[in-house]
A protein has these predicted regions:
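Alpha-helical cap/lid subdomain in secreted, periplasmic
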Residues: 88-244
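Histidine-centered active-site loop/cap adjacent to the catalytic His
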Residues: 209, 213, 245-278
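Conserved SGNH/GDSL esterase-like catalytic core that processes O-acyl groups on lipids
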Residues: 12-18, 23-126
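Short flexible/disordered coil segments
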Residues: 41-56, 61-67, 172-173, 231-252
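Short, amphipathic alpha-helical "lid/cap" segments that border enzyme active or binding sites
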Residues: 81, 150-153, 157, 256-267
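Extreme N-terminal starter segment of soluble prokaryotic enzymes
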Residues: 1-3
């Protein structure tokens, strides 16, 4: 059994792997609902094992969830909501499960980028000197950008810490959100849907640098928790590192074609885990 936990970025994966006639959009667990993974009927040959999915939101608050999924208590240890604890403990104790894939949030870099819509900013990312500073943009020190991203990421990283703590038996794998699409691609997407989309008004290179910093911080943190991260599929990105138009659902989400590439990565990870368990 494969377990998959996340929110909106799950949809690309489910669009790619769900059996015909199977709703690909797994409803998010309601705030008044007991937590549970739901089995998803799959297309033949997409994944090497059955799949159970739970769609959550890190901001859940309700009787089953508590004030938050995870919070840092004043005395230091993690406070894990009862519903979330039950969800994870159930996965960890399922003897048929070897791997839990996790795709949480992903909009943190996007939210920070929106601050540049009215007041354009830029910053130097040392590992990408090709992404030069843009004229007319206020230059913000890297440590200031990183501190703001750390704030955006805080709740997600606490949630990942709880997952690692409650699922010690499982191989936990982080699925990163896709990189941003180019400004031109997002603008074209917005125009075809007759809706405003502010994201394309932030320069492509700035959004890409924010994503690279965000993904690097996330991967570094999860590595310390013994959580591996899937790479972004090379076929889906331009040489610069932005998401190709053929693989985008909107400015920040991948589509079913992107999801199919992620499914192939998941299948490889699960197959290796199954061989290792023999």
């Amino acid at each position: 059994m494969i377990y998959l936990l996340g929110a909106s970025h799950l949809m690309a994966i489910l669009d790619a792997c769900a059996a015909p006639g199977q709703p690909s959009a797994v409803p998010a667990i309601g705030q008044g609902q007991a937590p549970a993974f739901r089995e998803c009927a799959l297309r033949d040959g997409v994944l090497p094992d059955r799949l159970r999915v739970a769609s959550i939101h890190v901001g859940h608050t309700a009787p089953f969830w508590g004030p938050a999924l995870v919070e840092m208590l004043p005395q230091g240890p993690l406070g894990i909501a009862a519903g979330f604890q039950a969800l994870l403990t159930g996965a960890n104790t399922d003897a048929t499960c070897l791997t839990l894939f996790v795709s949480l949030r992903g909009e943190e870099y996007f939210n920070l980028g929106l601050a540049g819509v009215d007041d354009p900013f830029d910053f130097v990312l040392p590992q990408r000197p090709d992404l030069a500073l843009l004229p007319g943009h206020a230059v913000i020190p890297l440590d200031v950008i990183q501190a703001q991203l750390d704030q955006q990421l805080a709740r997600t990283l606490l949630t990942l810490t709880a997952i690692a703590k409650l699922c010690p038996r499982l191989q936990v794998v982080r699925i990163p959100c896709p990189p941003p699409a180019s400004s031109d691609d997002v603008a074209a997407w917005a125009a075809t849907r007759d809706r405003p989309e502010r994201a394309h008004r932030v320069a492509t290179s700035v959004r890409l640098k924010l994503w690279l910093l965000y993904d690097g911080l996330s991967a570094q943190f999860t590595t310390g928790l013994a959580i591996n991260s899937l790479p972004v599929p090379e076929q889906a990105v331009h040489r610069l590192g932005t998401l190709k138009a053929d693989y985008m659902q909107d400015g920040i989400h991948g589509n079913a074609r992107y999801g199919a590439l992620v499914c192939a990565q998941m299948a490889s990870v699960v197959s290796q885990a199954m061989k290792g368990a023999l």
